[in-house]
Amino acid sequence: MSEQKLLLFRKWDTTEIVINDLGLKTAISLKQVIIPLDFGRSALKRYNKGQVNIVERLANKLMHFGKKYAKNTGRQGGKKHHSLNIVKTAFEIIHLKTGKNPVEILVRAVENSAPNEDTTRIVYGGTVYHVSVDVAPLRRVDLALRFISDAIKEATFSLSLIHI
């Protein structure tokens, strides 16, 4: 009996995707699921979010709308099914326009937008110095997904895109 592949949203295969960035191989999970839902099981251990599917992490980032004025409620607050439908529709549009696997395009976007260095503040005798430090792989993926989701939100609600 042959083993059946689990396709993401019953359409896209994640087994053939290769992660080119060696530092991100442990932080990007492409485990086979039909619907990327974890039900918060990853929150039980400290570094367990690296085991969560990258598509689910993108949907989680889309649910949070920013820190200013408690924007994690309202439009997308807690509506994960709505966020997953948005991601699924976006994947279908990407597949129609490019003809490629949209999960692979998401992985390439995360690899390209993940920062390698960041700055931190060091205080010596009242003087503040900014020192560059390397970024951990999980933080690199978190920042890349945050940059992507912020760009999505900015493009969605931008007034420059509205044609009068």
Spans of model-derived segments:
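Acidic, compositionally biased tether/linker regions
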Residues: 51-53, 57-66, 118-159
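Conserved small/polar residues in nucleotide/adenosyl-binding loops
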Residues: 162-164
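Ribosome large-subunit tunnel/peptidyl-transferase-proximal elements
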Residues: 33-104
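Core subunits and conserved enzymes of cellular information-processing
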Residues: 94-99, 108-111, 133, 137, ...
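C-terminal end-helix/capping segment
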Residues: 100-120
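Contiguous, often N-terminal, cationic amphipathic patches that form binding interfaces
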Residues: 1-56, 125, 129
